[in-house]
Amino acid sequence: YDLSNNEPVTEKKNPEGIGLPLFAWAEYNLYHKSANKRRIKEVMPVLQKYMNWIDDTFKKPNGLYAVPFQASGMSNAPRDGAVYPVDFNACMALNASYMSALGDILNDKELSFQYRKMYFSIKTRVNSLMWDDKTGFYYDLDKNEERLKEKTIAGFWPMLAEIPNADKADCLVNHINNPKTFGTDHPFPTLSKDSPS
C-alpha cells in the first residue's frame, strides 16, 4: 500500500492484488489465543465480503478459482500457464472451513453450514480435477483445465486443507520422503527433484 497516494501497490500480472486467502484461518487462531468472541462478530461481515469478492471475481464455472499464479507468492516457481493454481484453491477450501468454524463460534448454524458446503464443493473439485492418480500428486491447471505436469511445493497445500483422503495423503507423504522427488537434503524444495525445468 502506497501511503503517498493511498493506492494499493500491485503487480502487472496480478492487478487485483489477490493473495492467498487465509484471513479466516488467522482470525480463528487469534480467537483461540484471546477468546474474544466480540471480535469474531465484528470481523465476520468483512470476512464474508472478502469471500464474496473472491467468488464474484475469480470463481469459474468448473467451481475452481482462476487467479494469477503470483497470488501464491511463489513467483520463482516455473508455473507458466497455470490458470487454476492448486495452492490458491486449497487455501480457498481451508478458508471456507475456518469460516464455518467461526460460524460455529458465533452459534450461527446457517453461516457455518454455508461455508462447510463451500469447503466440500472446493474439496471435491480439487480432488477430481487437480489430482493425478498416476503420479500421486496435485497439479495446477491450465486454461483448458489440463494438469500442468510440474510438481511444485504448491501440490502439498491440499494436505493443510484436509482435502486428500488417507490414500492420497500417503502418496504425498511418500513424495516428501522420496529422494527422487521432494526428499532432498534441504527439505521442501520449490520443485521436485525430477522436475523437467
Predicted segments, located by residue:
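Extended glycan-interaction surfaces of carbohydrate-active proteins
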Residues: 1-14, 56-84, 124-197
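Short amphipathic alpha-helical coiled-coil/interface segments
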Residues: 47, 112-130
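Well-ordered alpha-helical scaffold segments within catalytic/enzyme domains
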Residues: 22-39, 90-109, 157-168
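Aromatic-rich carbohydrate-recognition surfaces in CAZymes
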Residues: 1-64, 85-89, 93
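Short, contiguous, pocket-lining structural segments
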Residues: 15, 80-94, 111-114, 118, ...
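Aromatic side chains
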Residues: 31, 50-53, 115, 138, ...
